[in-house]
Amino acid sequence: MKCYKSSSILSTNHHPFFYKQQPISSLQPTSIPTTISYPTRTRFSSTRIQSRLTHDDPVKQSEDLSFYDLLGVTESVTLPEIKQAYKQLARKYHPDVSPPDRVEEYTDRFIRVQEAYETLSDPRRRVLYDRDLSMGFSFSFSGRRQNRYDQEVVEEKSEWKAKWQTQLSGLRRRSNQKDNNTMSWAARMRRQQQESS
């Protein structure tokens, strides 16, 4: 490949892009043409259109935002500021107040804002989120997914349920013992048989 200098654009009726080139070396090759034409049609138009559509779509834009960016606050924000930002956005994107032609878009945005608020308003979940965010993990929204923060809530509820069931079974046992003291031997045997079957 040869290097050329002093390229200039020449315009004709058929092709707007012709380049007249002069070789740098003193030897002028005879096989290299002095003009090069480029097609007038480019394939970049579809890329530009796609790019513009992506940037014009606020729902697609919000998928790439962190929860802080979604609420429009900084990472050093306080809880009252998070609540205030959430209330403003919830009023703006609530499905009941959305234009009829943008209900789906507003609903998606409202759900994202709700998830951001739930995560950032809970101190434990916020610490986990901040840690993961500082490590560069991506948080793309997938709609009420079971993420790590939700999993912790589920675990807490299951622990609470296990404690509650233990207490309930203890109360039943004491109640049965109290009833057993006032029942006859035959009544206690019938009751045991019913419980075992």
From Swiss-Prot:
Keywords: Chaperone, Chloroplast, Plastid, Transit peptide
Triggers of expression: Down-regulated by mechanical and gravity stimulations.
Intracellular or extracellular location(s): Plastid, Chloroplast
Pfam families: DnaJ
Record-linked InterPro entries: DnaJ_C/III_chloroplastic (IPR053232), DnaJ_domain (IPR001623), DnaJ_domain_CS (IPR018253), J_dom_sf (IPR036869)
Tissues in which the UniProt entry reports expression: Light-grown seedlings.
Annotated transit peptide: 1-60
Protein's job: Plays a continuous role in plant development probably in the structural organization of compartments.
Name of protein: Chaperone protein dnaJ 20, chloroplastic
Taxonomic source organism: Arabidopsis thaliana
